[in-house]
């Protein structure tokens, strides 16, 4: 068996792409998208018709915002025709600090999916793991609108999401690594900080162990990988969302893949509970320079790509 086949014995494999043609060959269970991936996909000629149809069908009666929503849903529906499981569709990052607007947008997106005959159980609404986003997820989960909490970089965020009853979290492995590498500069030691000692891998393991120790139902899906070594160091995580480039590398790899994370191991560990109320959340996030900086940066990047996508839609509509 290749590395991808072995990994599937321990972990649900998810495709992290808006390029649904590319994901077919890897047979993922679920798929994740974000504004950056959708923007990248619509640059390709084969996806241009989806963009043009969204503009043609909806610009007159629902404006730019409506076209953007319809484009996200169009990609989601195409993906759901390929994967047997779920697709993650992201709420505009510019709503990251507005609980009510996030709830309203999520309800609207789910309504659009349901108009196309897609059951809400097959959709995860991606929301940034700000305090306001987590509160939105708490409301939405009670309505059976399942949430994927993204831009997650710390245990404090993870615990608050689990306490809110979020369906799933997406801790960003690669972006955590990026921060520590940048801080270390020339002193960075790739050997000492590789494999299971990778700071992004350690963060996900800490979160996974906490969840399993205290019996949270929230799923852990590692995301944002820089290489297959990070992925294989998290074999056993509930889910891992992986880019097509790294899926291809795993499919071509022949190394033995060992289980790295397990419920039994987590439950046997010595883990202390942490507070998840608002003052504790804000203080812990403030004290974690990496998480604070990467959360802010991630929101800015996703918002910027949403603006680029809007500009593209606006040019087509004019």
Curated annotation (Swiss-Prot):
The record's section on Gene3D superfamilies has: Aldolase class I (3.20.20.70)
UniProt catalytic activity: D-sedoheptulose 7-phosphate + D-glyceraldehyde 3-phosphate = D-erythrose 4-phosphate + beta-D-fructose 6-phosphate
Active site: residue positions: 126 (schiff-base intermediate with substrate)
Q: Which UniProt keywords apply?
A: Cytoplasm, Pentose shunt, Schiff base, Transferase
Pathway the protein acts in: Carbohydrate degradation; pentose phosphate pathway; D-glyceraldehyde 3-phosphate and beta-D-fructose 6-phosphate from D-ribose 5-phosphate and D-xylulose 5-phosphate (non-oxidative stage): step 2/3
Residues crossing the lipid bilayer are none
The answer to whether keyword DNA repair applies is: no
Q: Does the keyword Cytoplasm apply?
A: yes
Q: Which InterPro entries match?
A: Aldolase_TIM, TAL/FSA, Transaldolase_1, Transaldolase_AS
Q: What is its EC number?
A: 2.2.1.2
| Listed SUPFAM superfamilies | Aldolase
Query: Where in or outside the cell?
Result: Cytoplasm
- GO molecular function terms here? transaldolase activity
- A single BP term in Gene Ontology: pentose-phosphate shunt
Gene Ontology cellular-component annotations: cytoplasm
| Xref: HAMAP family | Transaldolase_1
Record function comment = Transaldolase is important for the balance of metabolites in the pentose-phosphate pathway.
The protein's matches in NCBIfam families, at most eight in alphabetical order, are given as:
talAB (TIGR00874)
Membership in a protein family = Belongs to the transaldolase family. Type 1 subfamily.
Q: How does it assemble?
A: Homodimer.
This chain belongs to the protein called Transaldolase
What lineage, starting at the top, does this entry show?
Answer: Bacteria, Pseudomonadati, Pseudomonadota, Betaproteobacteria, Burkholderiales
């Amino acid at each position: 068996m290749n590395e991808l086949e072995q990994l599937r014995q321990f972990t649900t494999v998810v495709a992290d792409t808006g390029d649904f043609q590319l994901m077919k060959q890897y047979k993922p269970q679920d798929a994740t998208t974000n504004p950056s991936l959708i923007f990248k996909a619509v640059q390709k000629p084969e996806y241009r018709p989806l963009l043009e149809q969204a503009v043609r069908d909806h610009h007159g009666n629902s404006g730019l915002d409506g076209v953007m929503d319809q484009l996200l849903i169009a990609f989601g529906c195409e993906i759901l025709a390929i994967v047997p499981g779920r697709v993650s569709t992201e709420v505009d990052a510019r709503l990251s600090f507005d609980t009510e607007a996030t709830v309203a947008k999520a309800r609207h997106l789910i309504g659009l999916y349901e108009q196309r005959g897609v059951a809400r159980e097959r959709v995860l609404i991606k929301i940034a793991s700000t305090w306001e986003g987590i509160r939105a997820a708490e409301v939405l989960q009670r309505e059976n609108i399942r949430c994927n909490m993204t831009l997650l970089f710390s245990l404090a965020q993870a615990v608050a999401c689990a306490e809110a009853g979020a369906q799933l979290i997406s801790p960003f492995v690669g972006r955590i690594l990026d921060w520590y590498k940048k801080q270390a500069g020339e002193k960075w030691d790739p050997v000492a900080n590789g494999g299971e000692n990778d700071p992004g891998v350690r963060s996900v393991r800490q979160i996974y162990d906490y969840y399993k120790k205290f019996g949270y139902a929230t799923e852990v899906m590692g995301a944002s990988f820089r290489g297959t070594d990070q992925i294989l160091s998290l074999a056993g995580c509930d889910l891992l969302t992986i880019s097509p480039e790294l899926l291809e590398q795993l499919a071509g790899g022949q190394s033995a893949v060992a289980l790295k994370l397990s419920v039994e191991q987590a439950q046997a560990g010595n883990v202390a509970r942490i507070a998840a109320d608002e003052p504790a959340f804000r203080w812990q996030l403030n004290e974690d320079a990496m998480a604070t900086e990467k959360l802010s940066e991630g929101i800015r990047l996703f918002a910027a790509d949403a603006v680029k996508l809007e500009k593209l839609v606006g040019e087509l509509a004019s």
